[in-house]
């Protein structure tokens, strides 16, 4: 059964309960944006890996083909994306 937005949010919220999470995409290709203070002392690659690791089985099986991760602290998110 293909993953949906709620599946992604639920899994990420299990690791980062205080995160602001948004998901775009469908079927087997998604982009997630995760904003949490937990990322404050983590490097960008560490942040992305912490989320991607949650979906290793789905990526390996092909159930999830593409997962793009944008992981920011609240301060980074507040600087504006423009």
Regions found by a protein language model. Give the residues of each.
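N-terminal, polar/charged subdomain of small-to-medium soluble alpha/beta proteins
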Residues: 2-82
